[in-house]
């Protein structure tokens, strides 16, 4: 709950109240919570950083990837199982975070119908990357070769279409 921004010192936050007002299982609320998890929870960040959208990854290969990243084998197996639990919740079914098969894990392009979720993702990205001037070109979101402290919202949400981004950004500026 803390990593999702919902609980601070055993009390619900203003963010939790906002999510409650929106409806816990709405795409908007799920998107906002997942954005917080992406930037505050190392396990969710690992999924984003290491699993590309639309690619099928054998669960055993994902375990090997985790072990190569110095995760203990037992923990690696647990992290792979946790992905299925996440995708079985509204994060997977409503937000479209991803899905699993018997053998594979897949991360999916999010369903984001509320541009405020994208705006929040951009805000958290800028904050995580300590970008004081808060200015960057759209191409910066797509460049995955840049070493930075936070995952690009393009990678996080699986939105790699420049025209889709332009439409979203124009919608935000209206």
Locate the predicted segments by residue.
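Donor-sugar nucleotide-binding helix/loop cap in glycosyltransferases
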Residues: 2-174
């Amino acid at each position: 709950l803390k990593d999702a921004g919902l609980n601070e010192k055993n009390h619900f936050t203003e963010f939790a109240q906002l999510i409650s007002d929106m409806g816990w299982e709405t795409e908007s609320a799920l998107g906002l919570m997942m954005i917080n998890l992406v930037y505050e929870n190392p396990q969710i960040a690992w999924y984003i950083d290491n699993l590309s959208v639309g690619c099928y990854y054998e669960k055993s290969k994902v375990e090997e990837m985790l072990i190569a990243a110095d995760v203990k084998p037992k923990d690696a197996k647990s992290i792979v199982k946790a992905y299925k639990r996440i995708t079985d919740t509204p994060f997977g079914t409503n937000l479209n975070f991803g899905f699993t098969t018997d053998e594979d894990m897949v991360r999916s392009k999010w369903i984001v119908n509320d541009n405020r979720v994208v705006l929040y993702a951009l805000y958290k990205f800028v904050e995580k990357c300590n970008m004081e001037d808060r200015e960057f070109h759209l191409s910066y979101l797509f460049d995955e070769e840049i070493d930075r402290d936070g995952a690009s919202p393009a990678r996080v949400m699986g939105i790699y279409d420049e025209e889709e981004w332009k439409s979203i950004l124009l919608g935000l500026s209206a």
